[in-house]
Amino acid sequence: MVDTVDKLGYFQAITGLEDADLCTEILQAHGWDLELAISSFTSSDQDASSSAVDGGGNNRDHDHNNATVTPDYPPRGIVDDTELVMRDDGGGNRGPGVAWRIITLPISIVSGSLGLVSGAIGLGIWAAGGVLSYSLGMLGFRSGRGGGSESARLVSVSSAVGEAMEFVALFDRDYGSNNAFKIDFVVEGFMDALQRSRSSFKLLFVYLHSPDHPDTPVFCGGTLCNEAVVAFVNENFVSWGGSIRSSEGFKMSNSLKASRFPFCAVVMPAANQRIALLQQVEGPKSPEEMLAILQRIVEDSSPTLVTARVEAEERRTNLRLREEQDAAYRAALEADQAREQQRQEEKERLEREAAEAERKLKEEEEARERAAREAEERQAARVRMRQEKALALGEEPEKGPDVTQVLVRFPNGERKGRMFKSETKIQTLYDYVDSLGLLDTEEYSLITNFPRTVYGRDKESMSLKDAGLHPQASLFIEIN
């Protein structure tokens, strides 16, 4: 049976990790089950989909192969397709070896920007399960698991914010109580921290924490809590930290290919959910070394950040100008609409007033016409009435003992006289006055002055003789 030393060597060769203590810790956590340890290291919480890998070719061709497996990352804040721009700082960072090519082949791109020697590596170390199992079988490291039982996972799944809170709390507990200075790690997921750095136009300082590594206490307490380092990092960076025992910290260590600890990196957002790796620092560093590295990165990146800030400010200014122009346009439009509405309301008011005036004029005209018709009708009725009453009077009788002579004086001074039989009713005298047509009203009374006697409508049934008007009478007309 292959001993633990051989398993450790194969695990380092396949994963690319140089830290023997970390590799031993991972293998121990999986009961020295090599296949399970590699599978846990190279996969997410769900089983990774496999992709075909061309196993032919020699060592010098491994940078030109493109065979990747896209993983499924449930936790928030992890992107499944991100590039990092890598600087080789002469620290001995090496690329994947021959055995690494069997599992995943990162794309290597060399480009220059801001004086930085840059390469690109994808976020995520992904394994094709079938190829991995076959390769380990060929090497003689098949799983020793029996009865289908599974070892416990190395990484427990929790929310990105919860993991960040736990990391900050543990870091403060272990190193913050004895140090007056500490880095302001954000309590949020990696992608949220990346977005924060983008919006604040700062670089993102990443620290991956290996709690059991022998160099971790000295590095955290002596370097990360150094006054000058803390002041510089808090001033110039957004800082995010994660434990490699957490889901997001573990995946970031895979994505950044962290092979030595303590591990720090400086990244910045790039297009299409990608990040640029500007610097990675592996292994213990003194405060002076760390500060020099970070100062150089800030100096080199300053033109880009200043340009981004200026462009963002220009965009905000342009947006504000557009909003002000839109607001002015809307205000002018609303004013025009208000004026148009006022003009329309005034027009409608004038139209209503004109219609009302026309209606009243029409009503007045109709009233005049109606009054004229009624007057004509009344006049015609009076004419007919006079004619009818004149006919009803009959012929004037000749003077005689039973004939009464009546003289009527009208208000205008005109006098009219006629002979009536003494038995004639006073009603006939009224009919006689009406038949003359000299009055415009029917509301009048016949009176005598000496003595004053009113022969009103209540006496119409009396005869002239009974009323004392025989043989002659002089009557006046009094308008009621």
Swiss-Prot record:
Key words of the record: Coiled coil, Ubl conjugation pathway
InterPro entries: FAF1_2-like_UAS, Thioredoxin-like_sf, UAS, Ubiquitin-like_domsf, UBX_dom, UBX_domain-protein
PROSITE patterns (alphabetical): UBX
Region (Disordered): 47-78, 335-383
Protein's UniProt name: Plant UBX domain-containing protein 10
Signal peptide range in chain numbering: none
Natural source organism: Arabidopsis thaliana (Mouse-ear cress)
GO cellular component: chloroplast envelope; endoplasmic reticulum; lipid droplet; plasma membrane
Domain UBX: 399-477
GO molecular function: protein-macromolecule adaptor activity; ubiquitin binding
Stretches of the chain forming a coiled coil according to its record: 330-389
CDD domains: UAS (cd02958), UBA_FAF (cd14353), UBX (cd01767)
SMART domains for the chain: UAS (SM00594), UBX (SM00166)
One GO BP annotation of this record: lipid droplet disassembly
